[in-house]
Amino acid sequence: MARSFVVGQDEQAWLELNATAFADHPEQGRMTLADLHERQAEAWFDPAGLVLVEDVSGDRPRLVASHWTKREPGSDEGEVYAVAVHPQVQGRGLAGPVTALGIGYLARTGARSISLYVDGDNDRALRTYRRAGFEIAATDVMLAHP
C-alpha cells in the first residue's frame, strides 16, 4: 500500500528503512533524525512528495520502500531525491513502481522535467531509471588523494 509521509509519525520507520537500504552509502545511509528535521525545514520539503510503501500482509504495516522527491519552489524541475527499497524485498520488482509513484507526484505538481543523481556503479538503479525513461545527461567523477 502506498501513502504519503506523515510528519511526527513516520520519521523513525523511514530512518530505519533508509539506513538499511543505503547501508553501504556514505551519506544517505547515515542520515540522523536531526538531518531529517533539517530537510523537513527546507522550503522544498513536502510530505506528500515522500511516498511510502508498506507491506500490510502481516499483523501491522511494515515500511518496505520509499521515494523522496524534491522540487524547489518556483522551479519547473523536479528531482528523484532518494528511492529506498528494503533489502529483504529487493529484486521483487518494487523499485520501478515506487519510482513511478514519485514521478507521478512530481508531474501532478507541475514539474516539466525530472533529474536524479545515482552512483555510476549502481547497476540495478541505473536499469530502473533507464526503464522509467531517464537518460544520462552528465557524468561526474570525484577523485581524492590519500
Specify the residue positions occupied by each region the protein language model found.
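A short beta-loop-alpha structural element at the N-terminal edge
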Residues: 1-16
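Conserved GNAT acetyl-CoA-binding A-motif
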Residues: 106-117
